[in-house]
From Swiss-Prot:
Name used for this protein in its record: Internalin B
Oligomer status and interactors: Monomer. Interacts via its LRR repeats with the extracellular portion of mammalian host MET; MET can bind HGF, its endogenous ligand, and InlB simultaneously. Probably forms a dimer upon interaction with host MET, which subsequently allows dimerization of the host MET and subsequent host signaling; dimerization probably occurs via the convex surface of InlB. Interacts with host complement component 1 Q subcomponent-binding protein (C1QBP). Interacts in vitro with human intestinal mucin-2 (MUC2) but not with mucin-1.
UniProt xrefs under NCBIfam families: GW_glycos_SH3 (NF033202), List_Bact_rpt (TIGR02543)
Start and stop residues of the LRR repeats: 75-97, 98-121, 123-141, 142-163, 164-187, 189-207, 208-231
Biological role stated in the UniProt entry: Mediates the entry of L.monocytogenes into normally non-phagocytic mammalian host cells. Its host receptor is hepatocyte growth factor receptor (HGF receptor, a tyrosine kinase, MET) which is tyrosine-phosphorylated in response to InlB in human, green monkey, mouse and dog cell lines. Downstream adapter proteins GAB1 and CBL are phosphorylated in response to InlB, which also causes cell colony scattering. InlB binding to mammalian cells is saturable and inhibited by EDTA; InlB-coated beads can be taken up by host cells.
Organism field: Listeria monocytogenes serotype 1/2a (strain EGD / Mackaness)
Domain notes per entry: Has an N-terminal region with 8 leucine-rich repeats (LRR) and has 3 GW repeats in the C-terminus. Residues 241-319 form an Ig-like region, followed by a 72 residue-long flexible B repeat region. The GW repeats mediate non-covalent binding of the protein to lipoteichoic acid (LTA) on the bacterial membrane. The GW domain mediates binding to host complement component 1 Q subcomponent-binding protein (gC1q-R, C1QBP) and to heparin; heparin binding dissociates InlB from the bacterial surface. The LRR domain forms a curved tube, the N-terminus of which has a cap that binds 2 Ca(2+) ions.
Residue ranges constituting the GW domain according to the UniProt record: 393-467, 472-550, 553-630
Entry GO CC: cell surface; extracellular region; peptidoglycan-based cell wall; plasma membrane
Length: 630
């Protein structure tokens, strides 16, 4: 029997078959029905305590009232019950109806179907739109051929393992994830599982008698298990919602494509969110700013047997917002990534000779002491500082420290006290030198170091490291030109960080477009790494530049444009700057095509449009290259 999965058609078909099989009350091979019986004439409402169900039985037996008495012979005459949308909450008493072959109780309020256990002749059972969760009571219904349990909120279908004789099964609009048990139901010709939470369909591979299969609105991304179902006449696979496991946000994100056709080949994404690209087998995104998810839409026509289907849906990749916690122990910094809104794992308490570790604090000198049991990661990078308590006010030590570059003007004193009358000079001349600390003291809660043969200075002016640490280093997209070359240079790394070497004077690059690649912050300032003509040059102080393009200048819009006839040779770019390294091509290939403008930016007085077709991202071009009419 072939069926189209249409609820109205399904129930019309069932009603017709109910009439055809209305005389199906004989038990095969003369077997005796093990059902409960009444021995004396009994009022209907005493047998069937649910008022609504009692009314159904009254009407079925053509009685005037539920107080009318009935005999077991009269109950034996009932072979089908149709009581859809009747507000029935219990079918208690149905065990006295041994010859029921068809039972239609859709749209009621049933939760317990244990009374059905002994209905050995039951062949058709439809219980859509109830509140049934436990299917174990169906295990002895060996004549059951057609079962419908749609819209019940079912998550566990393991109770169906005892029903291998089923030929049609409707389980749509539930909460099913695991269909392993269905591999046992090899006689099925119709199976509906639409609108569930199914991702693994391997258990269906052996159901070769299937003619009608409904799998729309699930989480399916791999069709290989369906390749052998050659008897299919109807197959539905649309609107799949596939959710990957969350991963950390990255500025350059790579996600493998796992959507597969029946032959195992990858299904190419049709539309990729957030300007992503597809480079088989990976989907790639450039995400300089955090977004909580990315996705792509897929579409693939599929033919299996006689069935033609549209396999399409969306794959969503959730992203975790992670930030950096820096643990600073007297200038030595260890960094770790932590998801926003979660608790931070406490690191091993640091040790320091002559000091007792007090705790981790949000500021070097005080602030909030971090409670690793109750405090949660905020939505930004931050530093926790190890705070120690001196065991004595002054003692002998033997340490090596360096002057922090930005502390060069800090004072040196005869005693561990900030008093101009005791001042001997500044730390400027001692930069970049390894300095020996031979004494330490605390005064007013401040830690002081005595530099051997030099004098006293605050410990906060010194560092364990010769070089500055970068507070962050991230990819950015921007363009700039030199604003102030005087006294500024270009470095292989941000100045005064480990490995930084002089490249050139900044004046050499005056007037040139500088493509900004990365941004880093050190205690001195914020730095940009830049390239010119596609060649990476180095790092420069951002204060020396004038940034004429950054992504925040882009504004969303919605326009339709066409390439101007005389502008087909003009170029389009990855960003709204006419720079050859980001050039993508010319507008000639899009001549006479309808283009969508989804973003605009005004760069140095010049209006730019970001264009795309209905499904493909193109790039940025000057608005002057386009016109409103075809």
């Amino acid at each position: 029997m072939k069926e189209k999965h249409n609820p109205r058609r399904k129930y019309c078909l069932i009603s017709g078959l109910a009439i055809i099989f209305s005389l199906w009350i004989i038990i095969g091979n003369g077997a005796k029905v093990q059902a409960e019986t009444i021995t004396v004439s009994t009022p209907i409402k005493q047998i069937f305590p649910d008022d609504a169900f009692a009314e159904t039985i009254k009407d079925n037996l053509k009685k005037k009232s539920v107080t009318d008495a009935v005999t077991q012979n009269e109950l034996n005459s009932i072979d089908q019950i149709i009581a859809n949308n009747s507000d029935i909450k219990s079918v208690q008493g149905i065990q006295y109806l041994p010859n029921v072959t068809k039972l239609f109780l859709n749209g009621n309020k049933l939760t317990d179907i244990k009374p059905l256990t002994n209905l050995k002749n039951l062949g058709w059972l439809f219980l859509d739109e109830n509140k049934i969760k436990d299917l174990s009571s169906l295990k002895d219904l060996k004549k059951l051929k057609s079962l419908s349990l749609e819209h019940n909120g079912i998550s566990d279908i393991n109770g169906l393992v005892h029903l291998p004789q089923l030929e049609s099964l409707y389980l749509g609009n539930n909460k099913i994830t695991d269909i392993t048990v269905l591999s046992r139901l090899t006689k099925l010709d119709t199976l509906s599982l639409e609108d569930n939470q199914i991702s693994d369909i391997v258990p269906l591979a052996g159901l070769t008698k299937l003619q009608n299969l409904y799998l729309s609105k699930n989480h399916i991304s791999d069709l290989r298990a369906l390749a052998g179902l050659k008897n299919l006449d109807v197959l539905e696979l649309f609107s799949q919602e596939c959710l990957n496991k969350p991963i950390n946000h990255q500025s350059n994100l790579v996600v493998p494509n796992t959507v597969k056709n029946t032959d195992g080949s990858l299904v190419t994404p049709e539309i990729i969110s957030d300007d992503g690209d597809y480079e088989k087998p990976n989907v790639k995104w450039h995400l300089p700013e955090f977004t909580n998810e990315v996705s792509f839409i897929f579409y693939q026509p599929v033919t299996i047997g006689k069935a033609k289907a549209r396999f399409h849906g969306r794959v969503t990749q959730p992203l975790k917002e992670v930030y950096t916690v820096s643990y600073d122990v007297d200038g030595t910094v260890i960094k770790t990534k932590v998801e926003a809104g979660t608790r931070i794992t406490a690191p091993k308490p640091p040790t320091k000779q002559g000091y007792v570790f007090k705790g981790w604090y949000t500021e070097k000198n005080g602030g909030h002491e971090w409670n690793f049991n109750t405090d949660y990661m905020s939505g930004n990078d931050f530093t926790l500082y190890a705070v120690f308590k001196a065991e004595t006010t002054e003692k002998t030590v033997n340490l090596t420290r360096y002057v922090k570059y930005i502390r060069g003007n800090a004072g040196i004193y005869k005693l561990p006290r900030e008093d101009n009358s005791l001042k001997q000079g500044t730390l400027a001349s001692h930069r970049c030198k390894a300095l020996t600390v031979d004494r330490e003291a605390r005064n007013g809660g401040k830690l002081w170091y005595r530099l051997k043969n030099i004098g006293w200075t605050k410990a906060e002016n010194l560092s364990l490291d010769r070089y500055d640490k970068m507070e962050y280093d991230k990819g950015v997209t921007a363009y700039a030109r030199v604003r102030n070359a005087s006294g500024n240079s270009v470095w292989t790394k941000p100045y005064n960080t480990a490995g930084a070497k002089h490249v050139n004077k900044l004046s050499v690059y005056q007037g040139k477009n500088m493509r900004i690649l990365r941004e880093a912050k050190t205690p001195i300032t914020t730095w940009y790494q830049f390239s010119i003509g596609g060649k990476v040059i180095g790092w420069v102080d951002t204060r020396a530049l004038n940034t004429f393009y950054k992504q925040s200048m882009e504004k969303p819009t919605r326009l339709t444009r066409y390439v101007s006839a005389n502008k087909a040779g003009e170029s389009y770019y990855k960003v709204p700057v006419a720079d050859n390294p980001v050039k993508r091509g010319t507008l000639a290939k899009y001549k006479n095509q309808k283009l969508i403008v989804d973003c605009q930016a005004t760069i140095e007085g010049q209006l730019w449009y970001r264009i795309r077709t209905s499904s493909t991202f193109i790039g940025w071009t000057k608005a002057a290259n386009l016109r409103a009419q075809k």
